[in-house]
Amino acid sequence: MNNAIILGIIWHLVGAASAACFYAPFKQVKKWSWETMWSIGGLVSWLILPWTVSYLLLPDFWQYYGSFSIATLLPVFLFGAMWGIGNINYGLTMRYLGMSMGIGIAIGITLIIGTLMTPILQGRFDVLLGTPGGRMTLLGVFVALIGVAIVSYAGLLKERAMGIQAEEFNLKKGLILAVMCGIFSAGMSFAMDAAKPMHEAASALGINSLYVALPSYVIIMGGGAIINLSYCFIRLATLKNLSVKADFSVAKPLLITNILFSALAGLMWYLQFFYAWGHAKIPQQYDYMSWMLHMSFYVLCGGIVGLLLKEWKCSTKKPVAVLCIGCLVIILAANIVGLGMAA
């Protein structure tokens, strides 16, 4: 195995670990509403960091964005908004299912929907049925379904074991949100495809191939930010049991700690761009490895962090054992789909 592939695997691990673990700092936020901490993290990950990075990368920030027509930018923005709906559902999935189970189910469903949606929308579903690679991909989808079912069963066992001690754990609500997450998260893939003219323009300015996609995040995540922040602000303004004033009236040391942990979560979320570095380091003939590595590391890291945070501190070990089996099945499914892409 050459150094490029080893480096690619390392960057994939960093990107997937950041994506899977970003919710961990939120777990340290105390006496704040979910909406307030999600908004603070979002301001960092969807607005501050994309704008800052793009400003540092581009020779002329305003000229670059001004060179595109509304017809080019609008689809990128709208698909970003679609992704934003998926992102809210992802965050709420973590809230109601926890990290280890939430990531397992959300990624499993995203794997299923993401694999099937593109060929269906492009009218090429027959390719999945009529080719060896397509049939292997469908096998991977079937295995992912089994994995999601196993992880869901682990959640049911956890629900029974923890009972009233699980304050926000809600299997039914979490499963519905995970399905919504899987459907709407496809917006990121569509947005990146629509943003290709922006990537080409960045490349023409001499920006390194590792970074050409980053300026498009200003538009993509701008769409997502409007959806996420609107959802949070409307709830904070209309629900009697939520209050920004109350959240920011906590003791000063706790206020600073909450802001820092929320901002750290936003930073870790943004560091998913290391995935692109890993993809760029993998030789073209092994492109399918990117999908396999990212999904596998994502589920693995999410499960490990969830266990370390003692989300599964039950009176019996059976739920944890079932969870581990389910996560391994989803990792297997990701690898089968990757092999199907390579066939």
Curated annotation (Swiss-Prot):
Disulfide bonds: none annotated. It is a multi-pass membrane protein. GO terms for cellular component: plasma membrane. Keywords: Cell inner membrane, Cell membrane, Membrane, Sugar transport, Symport, Transmembrane, Transmembrane helix, Transport. GO terms for molecular function: rhamnose transmembrane transporter activity; symporter activity. It is found in: Cell inner membrane. Pfam families: RhaT. The chain crosses the membrane at residues 4-24, 38-58, 68-88, 101-121, 137-157, 175-195, 207-227, 254-274, 289-309, 320-340. It catalyses: L-rhamnopyranose(in) + H(+)(in) = L-rhamnopyranose(out) + H(+)(out). InterPro entries: L-rhamnose-proton_sym_RhaT. Belongs to the L-rhamnose transporter (TC 2.A.7.6) family. Uptake of L-rhamnose across the cytoplasmic membrane with the concomitant transport of protons into the cell (symport system). NCBIfam families: PRK13499.1-1 (NF010021), PRK13499.1-3 (NF010023), RhaT (TIGR00776). This is L-rhamnose-proton symporter. It comes from Yersinia pestis bv. Antiqua (strain Antiqua). The lineage of its organism: Bacteria, Pseudomonadati, Pseudomonadota, Gammaproteobacteria, Enterobacterales.
